[in-house]
Amino acid sequence: MEPTSEYTETYDYYDTGYNDSGCDYSEWEPSYSLIPVLYMLIFILGLSGNGVVIFTVWRAKSKRRAADVYIGNLALADLTFVITLPLWAVYTALGYHWPFGVALCKISSYVVLVNMYASVFCLTCLSFDRYLAIVHSLSSGRLRSRATMLASLGAIWFLSCLLAVPTLLFRTTVDDTGSNRTTCAMDFSLVTLNQDHESLWIAGLSLSSSALGFLLPFLAMTVCYCFIGCTVTRHFSHLRKEDQKKRRLLKIITTLVVVFAFCWTPFHVLKSMDALSYLDLAPNSCGFLHFLLLAHPYATCLAYVNSCLNPFLYAFFDLRFRSQCLCLLNLKKAMHGHMSSMSSTLSAQTQKSEVQSLATKV
């Protein structure tokens, strides 16, 4: 099965296109206008929201919990990713023409995949931290130490960067002389020129990224929450104040996981179905492949929405985060008022000086 020249897949990071079976893979025209607008909206909300989260976590050093550190790193991953969205917005608006060169094609694609891995790994560590704090509250002191937390953060970023390396190797710009455009796509000519082998590479990398970046971590999170649910239910009748705080934090993290699953599941399902079609393990009809082509940009957009939702979830569920944000806003107002006061004082002093100078001259 060889990729069609009509359309080069831009959303699936381990895919070069849909199978060439003589079908018409024409894109839905409104997507060229709608998708860039959605990307820029996610960019604006994600940049401001995650910036506030990072600053809030950094500022509250004395009250920082282990969960806050993971949340801060989750926001950092999302912030790094949303910075690339203007490039993808322009790319889509130009009809999938990439004008930014090979380096930005590789780097921006790499950042997208690093974000996917780092986000799900941070959520997995958050879930495991809650599992230890609630199910093994008396015996998990060493596992929840600062050194262990820093080691897990190092492992998260190392694994995320490592697992995304195939994008750096294979993602490049491809000139399409037929449509007079340059696409940012996967090119496996470094490892094979055989179309069947290329299909295996596409399917293998696509399925492995979905397994490692979604399915296995989500299963681990599900197991953690099953144990947590049993423990919380068992001790529901006599919760101490400290336990109530744990429950509030648990509610926030559970919401983050559920929203993450809601946003990313359609993307991984469509990506896996496309990968299986390369292996002839899924329908290979024109209608099915055309459905994947039309649905994939919007499934991708839904996945990207997750990067701007988390700050609003913190603000809605976490009273402490809300109060810290209000303190931040009050600090800004105070600084603005102080600057205005200084400006007024300087202006008055300047006017007084000018009057004195004029009186001297007269």
From Swiss-Prot:
Extracellular side: 1-34, 95-106, 171-211, 270-284
Pfam families to which the protein is assigned, alphabetical: 7tm_1 (PF00001)
Gene3D superfamilies with a match to the protein in the record: Rhodopsin 7-helix transmembrane proteins
GO molecular function, one term: apelin receptor activity
Keyword terms of this UniProt record: Angiogenesis, Cell membrane, Developmental protein, Disulfide bond, G-protein coupled receptor, Gastrulation, Glycoprotein, Membrane, Receptor, Transducer, Transmembrane, Transmembrane helix
Sugar attachment sites: 19, 180
GO biological process, one term: determination of heart left/right asymmetry
Mutant phenotype after disruption: Morpholino knockdown of the protein induces embryonic lethality due to cardiac dysplasia with little to no blood circulation around 6 days post-fertilization (dpf). Mutant embryos show pericardial edema and accumulation of erythrocytes in the intermediate cell mass (ICM) at 30 hours post-fertilization (hpf). Display decreased angioblast migration to the embryonic midline during late gastrulation.
PROSITE patterns named among the record's database cross-references: G_PROTEIN_RECEP_F1_1 (PS00237), G_PROTEIN_RECEP_F1_2 (PS50262)
Locations listed in the record: Cell membrane
Disulfide bonds: 23-286, 105-184
TM annotation in the entry: 35-55, 74-94, 107-127, 150-170, 212-232, 249-269, 285-305
Primary location class: membrane
Superkingdom per UniProt: Eukaryota
Role this protein plays: G protein-coupled receptor for peptide hormones apelin (apln) and apelin receptor early endogenous ligand (apela), that plays a role in the regulation of normal cardiovascular function and fluid homeostasis. When acting as apelin receptor, activates both G(i) protein pathway that inhibits adenylate cyclase activity, and the beta-arrestin pathway that promotes internalization of the receptor. Also functions as mechanoreceptor that is activated by pathological stimuli in a G-protein-independent fashion to induce beta-arrestin signaling, hence eliciting cardiac hypertrophy.
The protein's name in its UniProt record: Apelin receptor A
